[in-house]
């Protein structure tokens, strides 16, 4: 037998319509101002965005939004969102989407608490502080909803690096299996 250590401080809220309670969960952690990060406009067309946003409003949480995260998230999108979070005075980042959105959220959360360039973290500068991170995961993938890692691509330098830090664990991850029901079986299983 090999000795090991295991730590996972992320709270998982699993079940149908759990995303409609995100405001309650965020309120429990003291969130007041959130940057919502997401990928495509499909989350608005499906009603998912409004379900989550309504919950935030019901719990007095102000928010701004930043959409357009792509697969293999980029530092340019992260920098854009960091500037928005700082200007807004965000205390939290809420990801609605898959692993790329959540990786972006983690980098944004760290960058919003840092005076330098967020890419510094991917070059070795340790994360000292981060905004609170929350997520509604819409695609099972790499386990980003329960880990401390973020992978970001620098499109200028053609580099793709990761960071790992205890400040980057999400506080609460919502998993509603219904949100993943339309994903192909092969994608979900493999």
For the regions a language model picked out, list residue spans one by one:
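Short Gly/Thr/Asp-enriched flexible loops that form oxyanion-binding sites at enzyme active sites
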Residues: 51-52, 82, 101-115, 146-147
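Secondary-structure boundary/capping motif
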Residues: 44-45, 73, 104, 144, ...
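ATP/NTP phosphate-donor binding region
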Residues: 1-92
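Glycine/serine-rich anion-binding loops at beta->alpha junctions
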Residues: 89-108, 138-144
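A glycine/threonine-rich phosphate-anchoring loop and its flanking beta-alpha core
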Residues: 20, 113-190
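Structural motif
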Residues: 11, 33-35, 63-64, 91-94, ...
């Amino acid at each position: 037998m090999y000795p090991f250590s295991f730590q996972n401080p992320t709270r998982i809220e699993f079940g149908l319509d759990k995303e409609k309670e995100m405001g309650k969960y965020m309120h429990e952690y003291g969130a007041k101002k959130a940057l919502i990060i997401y990928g495509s406009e499909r989350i608005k067309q499906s009603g998912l965005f409004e379900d989550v946003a309504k919950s935030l409003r019901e719990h007095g949480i102000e928010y701004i939004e930043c959409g357009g995260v792509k697969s293999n998230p980029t530092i340019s999108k992260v920098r854009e969102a960091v500037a928005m979070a700082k200007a807004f005075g965000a205390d939290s980042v809420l990801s609605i989407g898959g692993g790329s959105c959540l990786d972006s959220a983690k980098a944004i959360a760290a960058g919003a608490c840092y005076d330098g360039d967020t890419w510094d973290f991917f070059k070795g500068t340790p994360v000292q502080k981060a905004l609170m991170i929350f997520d509604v995961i819409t695609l099972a993938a790499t386990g980003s909803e329960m880990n401390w890692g973020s992978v970001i691509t620098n499109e200028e330098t053609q580099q793709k690096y990761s960071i790992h830090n205890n400040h980057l664990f999400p506080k609460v991850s919502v998993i509603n299996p219904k949100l993943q029901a339309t994903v192909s079986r092969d994608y979900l299983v493999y």
